[in-house]
Every structure is written in C-alpha cells, then in structure tokens.
Amino acid sequence: LEKYTEQAGLTDSYSISGLPTAKGSFDFDGITDGQLGWAGVGQYHDQVNPAALMIYMGAIANGGKAAEPYLILRTESALGLPSLPHFTTRTGRLISSDTASALADLMANNVTQTYGASRFPNMDLCAKSGTAEVGEGQTPHAWFAGFLRGEDTPYAFVVLVENGGGGSSVAGT
C-alpha cells in the first residue's frame, strides 16, 4: 500500500499554475494488519490533498496518466465566444492502464447502483464518495470525487465539504 500511494501520486505536492499544494501523507510506521486495512479505505492516518485526489481521478479516466491541472481564468475567448480549456501536459504513469480501466468500471457502476444515474442526467459519470474523519468530536469532511467519461467532457473533479458530514449525501448533490 505504501508503494502504491507513492506511485499513484497521492502523497505528492503538485504545482497548479505555479501554486504549490500540500503533500499528502500515510502513516505506515508500526502499523498492524487491522490498521493497514483501515488505511486501505482511507480511515487510518491518511491525509490526501484534494488536488492530488483530482489528479488521481484524471489518471483513472485517462488510462493511468492524468492531465496536469491549471487554474481556468476565463471560459470565453477575447471575442466573447465559449472557450473550453485544453489540457495538453500529462503526468507520468500513475497507475497501470488495466487498473485504471477496472477502477473506471467500478466507479461507473457505483454511480448507477449507489447514487442513481438519475441524479446526474446526461452525464457519463464515474465517482466515489467518502467521509474523512477529522478528530474526536468534530463533524467529518464529505468527499465526492470522480470524472466524466467522454471526449467532449474530459474533466476530473473533487468536491470537499469541510465538516459537512457524510459523503455523497452532502458532497455529491
């Protein structure tokens, strides 16, 4: 798990339009088998920066390599016409193409079977919700991360609601 989190970029600091992100961390020192199991589902001493998770979602969407994100300053050209961003720079391989394909299929099934595709009309969405515990007596953070499949909508995303409660019911609506 430690090797995978490093290779997948989940502990990296990324530069987004020149702005550095905080590194993620996983604590594997002296970990028991039970704690390793919890770490594997994000419920031990795991800290993942939302930007790193978004890049990981992009890697799943694109066969193992992600587009490098940047800030979108405007969505129209100087003439006032719609202009969607073009992502031309890619990361190195974060995960294998087989793993990316399997995860994409699982995430698509998750949307259909768990959240209901009707919540996301006209979208080929692959996503997973999560709840991040933040400390004793504090309301957990709600996560919803994924991507849109399709040539005309090649976008990965992360929604994080700090102290929002549970996963998709908060961050996935």
Where are these regions (language model features)?
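Residues within alpha-helical segments
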Residues: 6, 172-173
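Beta-lactam-recognizing serine transpeptidase/beta-lactamase-like catalytic domain environment
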Residues: 1-162
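Short, charged, low-complexity patches
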Residues: 53, 167-172
